[in-house]
Structure formats: structure tokens, C-alpha cells
Amino acid sequence: MQGNPLVVEVGQVAKQANGATVVRYGDSTVLTAAVMSKKMATGDFFPLQVNYEEKMYAAGKFPGGFMKREGRPSTDATLTARLIDRPIRPMFAEGFRNEVQVINTVLSYDENASAPMAAMFGSSLALSISDIPFNGPIAGVQVGYIDGEFIINPDKEQMEASLLELTVAGSKEAINMVESGAKELSEDIMLEALLKGHQAIQELIAFQEQIVAVVGKEKAEVELLQVDADLQADIVAKYNAQLQKAVQVEEKKAREAATEAVKEMVKAEYEERYAEDENLATIMRDVAEILEQMEHAEVRRLITEDKIRPDGRKIDEIRPLDAVVDFLPKVHGSGLFTRGQTQALSILTLAPMGETQIIDGLAPEYKKRFLHHYNFPQYSVGETGRYGAAGRREIGHGALGERALEQVLPSLEEFPYAIRLVAEVLESNGSSSQASICAGTLALMAGGVPIKAPVAGIAMGLISDGTNYTVLTDIQGLEDHFGDMDFKVAGTREGITALQMDIKIAGITPQILEEALAQAKKARFEILDVIEATIAEPRPELAPTAPKIDTIKIDVDKIKVVIGKGGETIDKIIAETGVKIDIDDEGNVSIYSSDQAAINRTKEIIAGLVREAKVGEVYHAKVVRIEKFGAFVNLFDKTDALVHISEIAWTRTTNVSDVLEVGEDVDVKVIKIDEKGRVDASMKALIPRPPKPEKKEEKHD
């Protein structure tokens, strides 16, 4: 635990919840409360809700905005809630339909002790000690990789230096959730990292088991969703053959139509048969569930026994691929990637660094330069549905693509732009998040972003009966829905840049992980072949519509000169030239415009503002003021110098105004700059000194 104590407190707070814990990890403190509804929900899914609530007081901060109160969850909070939900969800019994809520509240925040990992530990423990029928415990850890060594739960400094940012969770027996970004690491290193993480998980689970043995409650007896056995036997006998035939239709829409026709026929028959039965609603619910189970069983049987996939592909075969660049005019870059019936359009936008997103959460405020947003409209699957703000799934898929592509982006010094990619899923039959990564690569290269290497992504699946298993390459929607695993792998030819794994069973073995990673590598290379055949490398120039950029370096103490009082000077420059200007704390000035002449003019203005007089240099100056003791001349911009009366000429000057007048141009040489920055100049230093007159010899009589 990197020297941070892990302390668990039970029984002091939130005692009316089914289970509650306070987990103190370092100085991070998380309260987790788990509650369960008394009755089974009416829906056809398990209604589990996991929240991760960031309270700004935990970091000693005021919330932003007018209301000064926490609002909707941040992106990080949403991703953390998903991170906890995913390993917990498979640990409930099939048919369990009671609503369960797991609420994690961050009460104190320590950036060197992961609050999300404390929340995951607390979520598992709160469920385990409660009467909620949870088949845990589970635990999760973060894994870093520095100088060939794996580090469990690295602190902030270590994570910044790490080549790997991996979160892995699981039960005592197996891993059941993975989320990772990596700097092109090999499959062997990633597999070893997962196994190292699982060893640490087993220790944390042993700790939980000790606590559960002392304070755990007896699990409640709850009703599980079970169908009527006689009804099931009747439907299977009559209609299984027809449904099997429908499932084997290869094209998605045709298959959906065929299976739906069989289901509607069955529902109509049984609705008519039991129309007068007072339990009609329950019967029809069972009919729908039986049909779902029949389709589920047939898809899995085809794959495991006949080695036939619903669309006729081989186990390790990728759907037909197509890659297009420059799909859109005017934008800064675009790429259209199609894999079978999954299609994503990615659009690139470049902007000045002033457009970076400011992230103000529990961690210290920072700026985010690269954004990857993922949109999944309902028309992509031929359905109507909700439109509005991005949901948890869209946020999660966007973050996965962001991790995958971020690893190959040029540094800020190499490419001083803010970068935004938007993935529009136009058609979906599984693996749309991986299509968005491929489309993003196309858009970046088409837009002239000098990425280190193209990135491709692939989704792997699994069908397992507990003894035998089959790993699938490039899963489609039906295989994802009825399968046991969704394992997404993205990377370059050099190595992996992102992983994400979710499973519906208790866990998977190292052997399955190794096989899935090997198949994914082969598939990734095939996809990269198609991408590189379309565009082999990033274009050497940006799109004509993209903002041009130039940079100059100024001294840090000159930043205030360029900005001016209240931003007056920089605003005046922007108004005059029409450019955008960003200045960082180190004096790097970035100038953005589509007009190169405007950039050049801005550089001249700024260079003049920060220019400093130097002793020994000669300037063509203008007299701006005359005093009895000398004349003030303007060297450049706002820099004036004093030419003392004694420095005007080698001969004695009685009256300055007899020699100089305001507005006159003169050449001067800087001879002195004092500690206060006051400049003394000389005119006579540029004039040859006249020879001294010869002394007349005295004559003596």
C-alpha cells in the first residue's frame, strides 16, 4: 500500500443502511453505504446503482459556479462509479432483481492515497458485511510500471513517471475487471501486470474476509426471477427449431427480423391461450424470458460446439474493413472507419492552448489538452431513444478512446495545440468504441497531427461453460450480449496503449487472458494494415482551415509587460492583429491565426515590448524631452534613455536646446544601466574624439 495504512471502521455511522463502512486509506476517507429494496423490481435487468460522490470539502475547496454547491458528477466521478460497478455486478446471482444502491462519499481526499481504490474496497466490504446476497468479496488495485518494476497503488509522483496506469479488480479466484492506459507496452508485460495486481487483490480480499467473519450479517432470502418449468418445456419443444434457424441468419437486420417474428408468434399464441388467467402478466414475462434464454443458449451452442458464429465468420476472423480520410470539408481533419456493420466518423479540431479544459475537482486544478468525445445516437442501431447529455456509457467509451490515443500524441513543445476528437457512431453492431479509436487515428493523421504511430482497437469476446471456452475476435452485438466477456485492446505495432475488460461471469483465468491478448495482437496488426494503406503517416501540413501557430520565448519577468495592466496591452495587440495569444508561466508565447502576416506582425510587437537596452549597443533614437541637464531620447517602444549634457558633444554644451530639439532623430550609444533599470546614453561616444590642441611653447626673453 506504498506505506499508507488501510483502516476500516464498521458500526459507527450510517447504521440504518444494510451495510456501511468507513475506509481510511492514508488521509483519504470514504464512506460507503449499501442498501437493498425489499421487493423484486419489475424490469428485466438487475437494477444496480453505484455512485461515487466527490465532496469539495474533502479537499478543502469551495465548489465552483454561482450556487457554490456540488452539482452533477464530474467526468472523473462518473468513470470511478463505472469502475466500481463493473467488478461488483457479476457477483450477484442470476435472476436477482432487487434494487441495490451503493453510495460512496469521499469525505477526505489525499492525492497520494487513491480514494477510488478505497471506495472500491469499501463497496465490496459494505455489501459483504450486509444481508444483501452478494457473492463477494472483490477488491481492486492500481498498478504502475517504472524501470522494469511493478508498483501496487503508486502515489501521484510515481504514477506520473509510470509507463502504465492499470486498474484491475477481481475475486479471490480470478480477475473480472480491467481498465488501463499504457505507453506501448508488450502483451507479456501487460499480462504480468494483471497477475501482480491479482496477487495484491487476494491479500485485500483476505483482509475483508477476516472482517466479514466477525461482523457480517446473515444473507437475506430473496426471490430470484425463475420461469415456470412446464411453460419452458412446452415452448422449447414447439419453437426451439424455428428460433435456431432464425439465429443463424447472417445479416444483422435480417436476423433480428427473423428472431423477432418467431418471438412475436410465440407471444401471440400464449397471450391468447392465457387471456383469462389472472397471472397473465407473470406468464408473459416468463415467455419473454424463456425466449431470451433459448436465443442465448443457441448462440453459445453454435460457437462452442459447431464453431459457427452468427454471421458465419471464423472464430478469429475480423469483419470487412474500410478506412476513409477527408470525409468532411472545412474541418481540421476527419476519418471514417467501418468494420462490418459498425461505423464511426471522427472529426479533429485544433485550437489555441487557451481552449484547454480546466479540470477543477478534488485534485489540484490542471489543464487538459486532449479531449476525446464519443456520441452514440440511437439511429446507429435503427431505433428511437433518448437524446441529451452524454450518459455514463458514452463518457466511459470516450475516456477509453482518449487513453488509447493520448499515448501517441506529440508533446506540447512539438505541437502546441489543444486537440479535440469527436467520434460520431453512425452505425453499430458491436465494438463501436474500438471503431472510434481507429477513426480517431485516421482523423489525426489526415489533419497533420504528428502522432508517433497509428493506433487500432479490437474487441475480444468469450463463450465459456466453466470447462471449455472459446475466445472470439471482433465480437458483434449479439456475441457481446450473450457472451461472457468484452475485452477491448488498443495499441500500435509496438505495443498496447489501452485495455478495458468487463465480464459477466465470476472471473477469467490467466490462460484465457494470454490467449485473448495474442489473438487481439494479430487482429490489431490486420486493422493497422488497412489504416496504413489509406494514409501511411501524418500529413506534413495542417489543413488550410486549421489555425497556424508560432511561438516566441520571453523572460518570465516580461510576462506582465506583454499582458499589461488588467490585460490592456495584450488586448490591444489582439484587437490590432486579430490573433489569439497564449502565454504560459515559463514565458512561452504562442500566437495563433489563419493569417501568417498577422502572426508575424504580432511577433514584432511583442519583441518590441520585451526588448531590453544593452550597454554598448547603438540605437537610432528620437528626442522626446529636453531638460537643463540633458535630453531624454526614446530608444524603442517604451524604453527611454538620458543623454546627459556632458554626453552630447566633446565640446562644452552650454544650453541643450541650442543643440537638440524635441522630435529630432539622433544616434546614441548606451553607456550605463543602473540597478533600477535607468539607461544612460551618449551621443559623443559615436563621434571621434578631437585631438587635444598642442600646447604653445613659452618664449623667454
From Swiss-Prot:
Assigned keywords, A-Z: Cytoplasm, Magnesium, Metal-binding, Nucleotidyltransferase, RNA-binding, Transferase
Superkingdom: Bacteria
Metal-binding as UniProt keyword: yes
Pfam families, per the entry: KH_1, PNPase, RNase_PH, RNase_PH_C, S1
Keyword Nucleotidyltransferase on entry: yes
EC category: transferase
Function noted in UniProt: Involved in mRNA degradation. Catalyzes the phosphorolysis of single-stranded polyribonucleotides processively in the 3'- to 5'-direction.
Name of this chain's protein: Polyribonucleotide nucleotidyltransferase
Organism: Streptococcus pyogenes serotype M12 (strain MGAS2096)
